[in-house]
UniProtKB/Swiss-Prot annotation:
It comes from Ajellomyces capsulatus. This is Probable dehydratase NIT22. Induction: Expression is induced during iron deprivation. GO terms for cellular component: peroxisome. Pathway: Siderophore biosynthesis. Residues 220-243 are annotated as: Disordered. InterPro entries: HotDog_dom_sf (IPR029069), MaoC-like_dom (IPR002539), MFE-2_N (IPR054357). Residues 233-332 form the MaoC-like domain. GO terms for biological process: fatty acid beta-oxidation. Probable dehydratase; part of the gene cluster that mediates the biosynthesis of hydroxamate-containing siderophores that play a critical role in virulence via intracellular iron acquisition during macrophage infection. The gene is NIT22.
């Protein structure tokens, strides 16, 4: 598939060369040089242009969707906290709406890109199949889509309910990349949660979606998935936490709004080579955020400023997840969610099931002090 930008240039070349300055065959050119340029070299340039532009990759330009309204209730944020394993005790303020420090777990907005304003279950595959795709993008099958990478910046704590104000998710496709025949396609997107009346941005998130086996359509290869991502240090972790999932963990988590059948019944996972049902990638991502915040942030949601990780291999219901964390000390301002006068603590992490890495290249940034809470070093 030729590059759309190249096609436009090719049209301009053809138009210019074939117009021959609007001369008819009976009108002689003004000079011998002009005759050579128009009638002899012109066709050669056309052929060369066709050769060049026919081999150029299809570059998908950025594409922005219309804002999508989203809503949530206190019940939704309580359900989310329960689904990622928050416990009564040090995390009761995420689980009980009358707690004096009741707050929304900071990564909750990640599920709003699925939930929108729904109050009931929706057909995940039908909704995504109805998406408008960027010009030049091939048709993508969401039944073969899995998470590649997620990152979120936290600019303002979310209120316990959306009631009384209007909230929108602004989604932009940053690029669509062809990883090769038999491999797959990667779509990079950005999601911004904004309060409409004030214009205040609350969170900004980035995701890479990998569509298995859909490559070879002539698109740009794009960057490697592991370029410019943090790595874990070659030493023993400073903290380790474990989470034991069960057969119903995915069924509970999906009630947050992600109703992909891949995480509810064995058949889709078997057809994709996973052997059965797999957990939501964001389930592992969110329980890891909870572990990092508990270990290094005193379970204080406002401390979390930035969180990211790559999805390396699937997790199955019943797997035990071991979360390995490294304290990297203080770091400089590296995110728009942080004020210039704030100090940040950086934590690197990975997650394993046995010896297999399931989350890699993880990094969290936490505010060092918040209302007298000491940093756990």
């Amino acid at each position: 598939m030729a590059c759309p930008c190249g096609a436009r240039v090719l049209v301009e070349i053809l138009t210019g060369l074939l117009s021959l300055k609007n001369q008819s065959p009976s009108t002689p050119p003004e000079s011998e040089g002009e005759f050579t340029r128009n009638y002899i070299l012109g066709p050669k340039y056309i052929i060369k242009a066709i050769e060049i532009f026919s081999t150029m990759p299809n570059t998908i330009p950025p594409f922005e969707y219309a804002p999508v309204k989203t809503t949530w209730l206190k019940r939704d944020v309580l359900l989310f906290a329960h689904s990622i394993g928050c416990k009564a005790g040090d995390e009761l303020h995420f689980l009980y709406e009358l707690h004096p420090k009741f707050q929304v777990f900071p990564t909750y907005p990640i599920v709003l890109t699925f939930k929108h304003a729904d109050i009931d279950i929706v057909d995940f595959l039908a909704r995504n199949a109805a998406r408008t795709l960027p010009p030049g993008c091939p048709v993508l099958d969401w039944s073969v889509a899995v998470d590649g990478r997620r990152r979120m910046e936290f600019l303002c704590p979310l209120p316990p309910s959306s009631e009384g104000k209007t909230w929108d998710i602004h989604t932009k496709v940053l690029g669509v990349f062809d990883k090769g025949a038999g491999k797959g396609t990667v779509m990079e997107m950005e999601h911004v949660l904004k309060q409409r009346e004030s214009g205040q941005v609350y969170t900004r998130a980035w995701e890479s979606v990998f569509f298995k086996g859909t490559g070879g359509w002539g698109g740009e290869r794009g960057p490697k998935m592991n370029e410019h991502v943090p790595s874990t240090p070659p030493r023993r972790p400073d903290a380790v936490s474990s989470f034991q999932s069960n057969a119903e963990s995915a069924h509970l988590y999906r009630l947050n709004g992600d109703y992909n059948p891949l995480h509810a019944t064995p058949e889709p996972g078997k057809s994709l080579g996973y052997g059965g049902t797999i957990m939501h990638g964001l389930f592992s991502w969110n329980i890891t955020a909870r572990a990092v915040l508990s270990q290094f942030g005193g379970s204080e949601g406002r401390r979390l400023r930035d969180f990211e990780a790559m999805f390396s291999s699937p997790v199955k219901p019943g797997d035990k997840l071991d979360i390995l964390m490294w304290d990297m000390g203080l770091c400089k301002r590296a995110t728009s969610a942080v004020r210039n006068d704030e100090s940040l603590q950086e934590v690197r992490f990975m997650v394993k099931v046995g010896d297999r890495v399931v989350l890699s290249n993880g990094k969290a940034l936490l505010k060092c002090e918040d209302e007298g809470v000491e940093v756990k070093l």
